[in-house]
A protein has these predicted regions:
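Ligand-binding pockets and gating/stacking loops
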Residues: 1-187
Length: 187
């Protein structure tokens, strides 16, 4: 851990880089005419098998870090936030109920958080089945009702101005995905 922290320090500085300062810098770079089109941030700590906590736990800490990234990107982007899409990505969801260690296990369904001016509106877009046991996958997980790849393919199509079918073919190997662009993004 100490080697990682020191490797992220600027020579002559006592301040190590963190996602918040990187997000601010990334926002400033992304808004440049010839700047990059994509920035990627990693937020760990969501694999909370034990001691997940509530408003004070490690899960909350990770969500606060995500919020800081969103805020600093917006600050760095300024008015260019109107032409921006922020998309979160995860490899797994979490179970609904806590385990005996006050954490959660890997789950089936999940959520994708998005922000930015390219979104059609503030919304929860879902085919929500509910939280009753009969509605859960294997009586423990959110049921996955929308293929996350449909969201990602639609986002790529919108942001990079590439035909959805082309993204579907070249990135997702012609899998049967739903184009959600008209439901999620401004035209």
């Amino acid at each position: 851990e100490i080697i990682y922290q020191r490797s992220m320090m600027k020579k002559g500085s006592s301040m190590s880089r963190n996602n918040n300062s990187l997000a601010l810098k990334a926002g400033k770079e992304l808004k440049k005419i010839n700047g990059p089109r994509v920035a990627v941030f990693e937020v760990g700590g969501f694999d909370t098998h034990a001691a997940q906590g509530g408003i004070d736990g490690s899960h909350s800490d990770s969500l606060i870090e995500m919020d800081g990234i969103f805020k600093n990107l917006e600050k760095g982007l300024g008015n260019e936030m109107d032409n921006t899409l922020i998309v979160t990505l995860t490899e797994f969801g979490r179970t609904i109920k806590q385990n005996s260690g006050l954490g959660t296990e890997h789950g089936y369904g999940s959520a994708i958080f998005m922000g930015g001016g390219l979104l059609k509106k503030s919304q929860v877009y879902s085919d929500w089945p509910g939280l009753k046991n009969k509605d859960l996958f294997e009586n423990r997980d959110l049921n996955s009702t929308i293929d996350a790849r449909s969201v990602y393919a639609s986002a790529m199509s919108k942001v990079f101005d590439v035909d959805f079918k082309e993204v579907q073919k070249e990135v997702f190997w012609n899998d049967n995905l739903q184009n959600l662009s008209d439901k999620l993004f401004k035209t």
